[in-house]
């Protein structure tokens, strides 16, 4: 089985992303989409319920405690409590955070194929535009120019060289540049410029966790500090490599430190992603 899990959720993003997931459900690739209800926003909760009604393979999952927001109306420190629903032995789980707003055709299939071909890998990670480590790599290969500033380059032994680079996830000019560059490349048909080699890593990297894939049989169970744990610590503890699928491309809209700026601009980029999501 293939199950998608999404800590959920914000209507303005899910209304775009669901079109991709629904299409893959219709194609028979996805068996279930778990919406992990992690918000107190009543409008968003109503939207999640409408999604559950409109597609029989969408199901809302809850936890037996109150959601206490840390940012906006959701609590990232409670997300780990939903992992108990993602531990069936015969299932491949793929996490997409609710602000993954574009996935290249074929990327999901590439992730699943990598999961099957690399059974010993602890996690499979895709190539995510606007994720800290990938932004650094995209600048290194020239897919994203440095005209608005450079993010930190890799430092051997420093797992957080990109993750803790505040410029990487807070600068307003950089996030504009990231989205504008993607839109330009999309229109000119040069998205392959972002591609990186598929690679197994035994020297762990701090990957973004807004999308990753694991086996249910591994009984993955992070704690409240899931970011470093899912990014590299669990893999290191398991003593198993991770696998990066460099040609499985997707777009992460915003870190919470970028969101206020984009919202104040009117979320102008969402119109593009909505128009290109089918």
Segments and roles (model prediction):
Residues 1, 16-17, 168-278:
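C-terminal catalytic/acceptor-binding lobe
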Residues 3-11:
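A conserved hydrophobic helix/loop-capping motif in glycosyltransferases and polysaccharide synthases
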Residues 10-29, 43-47:
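Short, well-formed alpha-helical segments that are part of the catalytic scaffolds
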Residues 13, 42-45, 102-104, 131-136, ...:
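Short catalytic/ligand-binding loop motif for oxyanion handling, primarily in non-cytosolic enzymes
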Residues 35-95, 101-108:
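Active-site-proximal specificity loops/subdomain of glycosyltransferases
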Residues 47-48, 107, 135-140, 255-258, ...:
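Short aromatic-enriched loop/helix-cap "lid" or pocket-rim segments at secondary-structure transitions
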Residues 95, 103-104, 122-127, 243-245:
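A structural signal for short, well-ordered beta-strand segments and their strand-loop junctions
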Residues 107-220:
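Conserved catalytic core of nucleotide-sugar-dependent glycosyltransferases
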């Amino acid at each position: 089985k293939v199950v998608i899990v999404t800590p959920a959720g914000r209507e303005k993003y899910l209304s775009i992303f669901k079109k991709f997931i629904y299409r893959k459900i219709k194609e028979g690739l996805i068996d279930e989409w778990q919406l992990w209800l992690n918000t107190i926003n009543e409008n968003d909760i109503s939207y999640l319920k409408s999604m559950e009604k409109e597609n029989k393979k969408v199901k809302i999952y809850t936890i037996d405690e109150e959601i206490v927001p840390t940012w906006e109306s959701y609590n990232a420190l409670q997300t780990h409590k939903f992992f108990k629903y993602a531990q069936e032995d015969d299932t491949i789980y793929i996490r997409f955070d609710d602000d993954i707003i574009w996935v290249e055709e074929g990327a999901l299939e590439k992730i699943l194929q990598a999961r099957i071909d690399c059974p010993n890998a602890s996690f499979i990670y895709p190539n995510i535009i606007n994720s800290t480590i990938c932004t650094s790599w995209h600048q290194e290969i020239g897919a994203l120019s440095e005209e608005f500033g450079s993010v930190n380059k890799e430092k051997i032994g420093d797992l957080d060289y990109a993750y803790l680079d505040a410029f990487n996830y807070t600068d307003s000019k950089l996030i504009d540049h990231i989205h504008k560059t993607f839109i330009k490349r999309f229109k000119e048909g040069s998205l392959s410029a972002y591609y990186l080699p598929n690679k197994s890593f035994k020297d762990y990297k701090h990957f973004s966790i807004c999308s990753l894939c694991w086996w249910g049989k591994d009984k993955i169970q992070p704690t409240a500090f899931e970011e470093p744990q899912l990014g590299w610590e669990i893999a290191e503890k398991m003593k198993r490599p991770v696998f990066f699928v460099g040609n499985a491309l997707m777009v992460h809209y915003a870190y919470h430190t970028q969101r206020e700026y984009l919202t104040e601009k009117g979320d102008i980029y969402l119109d593009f992603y909505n128009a290109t999501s089918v």
